[in-house]
Amino acid sequence: MMVEMDYAKKMQKCHEYVEALEEEQKKIQVFQRELPLCLELVTQAIEACRKELSGTTTTTSEQCSEQTTSVCGGPVFEEFIPIKKISSLCEEVQEEEEEDGEHESSPELVNNKKSDWLRSVQLWNHSPDLNPKEERVAKKAKVVEVKPKSGAFQPFQKRVLETDLQPAVKVASSMPATTTSSTTETCGGKSDLIKAGDEERRIEQQQSQSHTHRKQRRCWSPELHRRFLNALQQLGGSHVATPKQIRDHMKVDGLTNDEVKSHLQKYRLHTRRPAATSVAAQSTGNQQQPQFVVVGGIWVPSSQDFPPPSDVANKGGVYAPVAVAQSPKRSLERSCNSPAASSSTNTNTSTPVS
């Protein structure tokens, strides 16, 4: 009875263990892409437990008899039923570890393992019946055939063009693989440099063509300027006319509004300069002190200070005549010829001399 109780407890524990594993399997199925190996291990454990339960139910009588004999004093040979699948997997793992221990010095196998873990997705779906060597060859083939279809991280791979591969194929027939890889890299680098130089030359040619295709600057000939002035006179002056109106009046082929506008601005600046110079000259002339000339003891302003008659009439100024000192000879002659002097002489002559 005690043996049957122990057996029932073991069966109950196995059922509970299977249920717990099934719950974990449901949780891991959500992250099937991220945790494929964990999901595979859990499913294998569930299958092993179920096989153990099915095997134990069919052989309950045999186990009970063996256990009763063991209780009676006989030796116990087996307590658990061995599982072929798990044992075979353990043996394969041990063999792989031994082979890896023999070939630890080769760095290529280490790199292959890393690439297997990073790139391969179907490594854990292998069949247990294959030999370790065949399994390793199948893994390598799968790594080569896998194509990046998902959005996961992929290592950077330089794109090699067909034109760059042609010289590399020719060199491969006469040189080993190590030298061919170096030559392909150098050829690819040279071709990239040549392409970059060609692009720069093409850009420079386009820029030079754009400079040549630019419109030349307008040269304003005397005839063109005369038309410009006629248009200004008809339109009412440079401050009233607009560039568009001037261009319409001039009727010149190829003349643009911008060219007329720039010429109009230059003309306005040119017409403003004489007015500014005349105002500056007047201001400097007013600041100069008047000059005087001494004539016969009288201060007389110089002729430069007198404006012309037209200016006098325009300004409306009044000027008085200036008496100029005469020479002494002419003054004596005039005094002799005057009637007062003659009468005085006559009286002097008529009076008797005492």
Swiss-Prot record:
Residues 212-272 form the HTH myb-type domain. GO terms for molecular function: DNA-binding transcription factor activity; DNA-binding transcription repressor activity; transcription cis-regulatory region binding. Residues 337-354 have a biased composition (Low complexity). Residues 93-102 have a biased composition (Acidic residues). It is found in: Nucleus. Induction: Induced under phosphate deprivation conditions. Residues 93-112, 324-354 are annotated as: Disordered. It comes from the Eukaryota. The keyword DNA-binding applies. GO terms for cellular component: nucleus. Keywords: DNA-binding, Nucleus, Transcription, Transcription regulation. The keyword Electron transport does not apply. Residues 243-268 bind DNA. Residues 103-112 have a biased composition (Basic and acidic residues). GO terms for biological process: cellular response to hypoxia; phosphate ion homeostasis; regulation of DNA-templated transcription; response to abscisic acid. It holds the Pfam family Myb_DNA-binding. Disruption phenotype: Reduced number and length of lateral roots. InterPro entries: Homeodomain-like_sf, HRS1-like, Myb_dom, Myb_dom_plants, SANT/Myb. Probable transcription factor involved in phosphate homeostasis. Involved in the regulation of the developmental response of lateral roots, acquisition and/or mobilization of phosphate and expression of a subset of genes involved in phosphate sensing and signaling pathway. Is a target of the transcription factor PHR1. NCBIfam families: myb_SHAQKYF. This is Transcription factor HHO2. The gene is HHO2.
